[in-house]
Amino acid sequence: MNENSPPAPKSTDLPLPPVVDKSQSLQGSRAIGRLGESAKITAIIAIMCVAFWVVKNKLVKANVTWAVVQEGISNVPYWQIGIACGLTALNYLILTGYDWIAVRHLKKELPMTKIMTGAIVGYSYGNVLGWLLGGNAVRYRLYSSWGFSFLEIVAFVSILATTFWLGLFLLAGVAFIALPIKLPEEVSEKLIFDHHVWGLLFLGCIGLYLAACTIFRKPIRVRDFEVTLPPFSLSTMQLVVSAGDFLLASQVLFWLLPSSQSAEINFSTVLIAYLTGQIITVLTHVPGGFGVLEGVLVSFFPEESLGDVLAAVVLFRIIYYFLPFIPATILLIYNEIRAKRRPKDAVQDI
């Protein structure tokens, strides 16, 4: 080698960058996702088991057997069952307002028949199977076949959730402040504050939301997302529709109580118990609130009336949950058949 030639480059001891196997990374993320879903399902089952355990202990303590519940069912007059069925039909018409508000806020045009189909199917499946397993899944199926994008459906479901909480807060606020409520001691102790304070807090949240809808007319940017609040007229419709929904649903439950118990158990207590059950059901994602609603109701009412209360819940689940599930399933199957025969329906912006 020539002495004047430049020295050969020295080898380095630095390690080479690791080779990332994208397939393994993807498999790992999927495994984590499956683990998370399994944990979620396990938690839901555990909550249901705890709820049923609470109900069972209450019933054993009150000496309530299935024969007592059957007797309570037989004591409900047919005319009260007829009223409950009529209120259920009216309630499901009111539920259409949830989807109508969401469609209007997204500035989309969709035939009223499809809006009604989406609402009836979505809420029927949500009531029986839960929102994660039923309601949101069938809504995605329906609205995607009608031309809604994934992000539009996400926004759609967010509007439905907002409307739900607005009506719940409004009714709970009014009930806590203005209505004669008889809360059991074990429930009152867990409220931390007096129920009148909770009523003011709930109504305060409603006032802040309406004020925000009036003031912020331009989209609010949150990181990479833009949130557009509905106009005041549409936000008041959210309150009317959701409050009407909860009032009618709790009226269905109230009318299924035997006549002898209706005088002892006032509607305002039934309303608060039903709203409490709805809150816990939504937060825990228990399908249909099975066990949760029963657990709340047996905690709100005296032991001597538990047989009649459980009888009312059994009838309520049949009339309000399972009967609408039949036409909802027929509508879903009909929509699936139509979707396979023709391309996706176009949805127009207003």
Predicted regions and their residues:
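Predominantly cytoplasmic-facing regulatory/coupling regions of multi-pass membrane proteins
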Residues: 2-120, 178-282, 304-306, 310-311, ...
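Cytoplasmic juxtamembrane interface segments
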Residues: 12-24, 128-143
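Hydrophobic alpha-helical membrane segments of integral membrane proteins
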Residues: 40, 142, 154-157, 161-162, ...
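Membrane-interface alpha-helices at helix entry/exit sites of multi-pass transporters
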Residues: 113-117, 131-136, 145-162, 305-316
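Transmembrane alpha-helix interface/packing and boundary motifs in multi-pass membrane proteins
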Residues: 121-130, 258, 275-294
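Mid-bilayer segments of alpha-helical transmembrane spans in multi-pass integral membrane proteins
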Residues: 123-132, 161-177
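Re-entrant/interfacial helical elements at transmembrane boundaries that shape
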Residues: 133-145, 284-302
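Discrete transmembrane alpha-helix packing/kink hotspots characteristic
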Residues: 151, 167, 323-327
